[in-house]
Amino acid sequence: MLLSVPLLLGLLGLAAAEPAVYFKEQFLDGDGWTSRWIESKHKSDFGKFVLSSGKFYGDEEKDKGLQTSQDARFYALSASFEPFSNKGQTLVVQFTVKHEQNIDCGGGYVKLFPNSLDQTDMHGDSEYNIMFGPDICGPGTKKVHVIFNYKGKNVLINKDIRCKDDEFTHLYTLIVRPDNTYEVKIDNSQVESGSLEDDWDFLPPKKIKDPDASKPEDWDERAKIDDPTDSKPEDWDKPEHIPDPDAKKPEDWDEEMDGEWEPPVIQNPEYKGEWKPRQIDNPDYKGTWIHPEIDNPEYSPDPSIYAYDNFGVLGLDLWQVKSGTIFDNFLITNDEAYAEEFGNETWGVTKAAEKQMKDKQDEEQRLKEEEEDKKRKEEEEAEDKEDDEDKDEDEEDEEDKEEDEEEDVPGQAKDEL
């Protein structure tokens, strides 16, 4: 069967529009993940990941992911995929993070490595291409890292992107485009965007201060000056403190014993402080001198800042003080729309049910604590009542004893007689 040229071109166009999915991991095959993910042996005490949907979830099976399981540990785990380059195409990196342990200090980011990485020796100093994701440590650090390795140097973003710091699952997306622009999304909503060249210090500045320029000696930057016609009044200078005119030497003051009497000092009501001439507009004021700039001879544009020759490994290389973070729904693709749709079909489908389950657990815990508190108070009241009854019985016994002793006294006296 022969196809018409328009139809053939249409089919080719549809094929070209298909998204390229370089890596996708949802952990839907139970323990099958252990054959795809490799633990680093660089250190013997790396923390262990386990497959779990956590203490609360929207869908117990779909929400299963890699969970950190040991406190105060470094973690190093990675998965490889068919190597690719993002030259000439968009790169989208996406995954979900859930800090259900109410994390105090720890990473929730991923690293993209070239396929030359020795996965069994991956560690914190292993060279990567891109690092992306949330990082939390105390109240001061709650940011989304976006770090690019450019010519062997890790370059951090110049902006502060705040991450989510609650206990729920959140979707993190990094988009890097071939026009050297980028976008960061959290929960499929844009939180930052811009130019790679503007928001990272990849290149020397386009402009520099002219080294041959200097501020003229007669350049006056003072907006105000002292009024040369103003002078200090003759009666201005008064002491700040004066002897108290109302003070009197005590009658029992002995100058031989106490020394010469001096009245206490008080604030002088006529004291005016330091005199300063009034200010007037400076007739010679020229404004703040601005150093002129010239084109930087060291600057050279790089249209390929965004591009990497080789991506081949996604790794979790991080430190956590309190474990419990769950990573899931990893995706690396070249299609922004596909990534957004994938996020909606994973995180988007289960987020509401996850919150409902957490709210229900919190309510059950609240009621349990109220019941325990009520029971504790009742037990304390019962103990107090029992103590009061015992005290009353002791007092009655003491009174009976005293009465018995009083009755015995006359008989005792009679016997003595």
Curated annotation (Swiss-Prot):
Residues carrying N6-(2-hydroxyisobutyryl)lysine: K64
Disulfide bonds: C105-C137
Residue span of motif Prevents secretion from ER: 414-417
GO terms for biological process, alphabetical: ERAD pathway; protein folding; protein stabilization
Compartments in which it is found: Endoplasmic reticulum lumen; Cytoplasm, Cytosol; Secreted, Extracellular space, Extracellular matrix; Cell surface
PROSITE patterns according to UniProt: CALRETICULIN_1 (PS00803), CALRETICULIN_2 (PS00804), CALRETICULIN_REPEAT (PS00805), ER_TARGET (PS00014)
Amino acid composition bias (Basic and acidic residues), ranges on this chain: 207-251, 352-379
Region (N-domain): 18-197
Span list, region Disordered: 193-278, 350-417
Record's comment describing the protein's domains: Can be divided into a N-terminal globular domain, a proline-rich P-domain forming an elongated arm-like structure and a C-terminal acidic domain. The P-domain binds one molecule of calcium with high affinity, whereas the acidic C-domain binds multiple calcium ions with low affinity. The interaction with glycans occurs through a binding site in the globular lectin domain.
Function: Calcium-binding chaperone that promotes folding, oligomeric assembly and quality control in the endoplasmic reticulum (ER) via the calreticulin/calnexin cycle. This lectin interacts transiently with almost all of the monoglucosylated glycoproteins that are synthesized in the ER. Interacts with the DNA-binding domain of NR3C1 and mediates its nuclear export. Involved in maternal gene expression regulation. May participate in oocyte maturation via the regulation of calcium homeostasis.
Name used for this protein in its record: Calreticulin
Gene expressing this chain: CALR
